[in-house]
Amino acid sequence: IVIRFAIILHIFLPSRIVPLFLFLLFRAKVSYKTVCDWTNKFANGIVLPEYNCAADILICHVDEKYVKVKGEWHYWWSIKDCFGNIIHAIITPFRDYDSAKKLLQESRRRIGRDVDILIRDGLNAYQRSAKFLGRKCRSVIAGIKGKGFIYKKKFYWITNNPSESLNSEIDFYLAKFQNNFANLESANRFANLFMLRKHLKKCLSEKKLSEASSLLIQAINF
């Protein structure tokens, strides 16, 4: 029960704080490194529910940001839909076409349908790899101020604010939990836990308690 409780706490709290709760509640003395080991061993078996979007037009936002791995700058790539759901995230050493392609290919498999509009920054790799989200996916550059856009005879006001706000959340999460990773594997594991945490918080805010409970049960039934 100590390990199970530690994993649930670590999804929401820094590893250095979790041992304090374990000691107060169970008088169990464990190190923060042990908590991290437990999470790495068991929590990554948690599978997020299948992505489901019933909207006629699916709009996604994509962006990348810096993150440190072994003291060197790498890139955290994220894609989310227009409803605030994080679809996928990866961390790679380079800000290039291959990384963008990997993100969008894996995202397309998770989405299970074509994306209609991809809102992005000026990185050319997105333009070249947008086809992996669907043959007819429209790749559109938009900044914080936004701009008008016509798609299938309908007017849309598009902005890349959702990506910028997500990057701010990632920065806060990194500052709170970890700002440098030992290797690329641990960095991507951390990105997966970030997605899990975001999904759980969204489930709870939308009162989808059964879905949140199912994910937490996965965390403790190992």
Predicted regions and their residues:
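Short, positively charged, Gly/Tyr-enriched micro-motifs
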Residues: I1-I59, E64-K70, E106-R108
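Mobile genetic element proteins and their domesticated derivatives, centered on retroelements
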Residues: A6, V18, V35, D63, ...
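Active-site beta-loop-alpha junctions of metal-dependent nucleic acid enzymes
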Residues: K41, A89-R113
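The start of beta-strands in P-loop NTPase/AAA+ ATPase cores
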Residues: L58, W76, F83, V115-D116
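A short, conserved beta-strand element enriched in hydrophobic/aromatic residues
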Residues: W76-D96
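Short, surface-exposed basic-aromatic patches at helix termini and helix-loop junctions that form
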Residues: K80, E106-R110, A130-R138
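Helix-centered, glycine/charged polyanion-binding patches within enzymatic domains
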Residues: G122-N179
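Basic, amphipathic alpha-helical segments enriched in Lys/Arg and hydrophobic/aromatic residues
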Residues: S168-F222
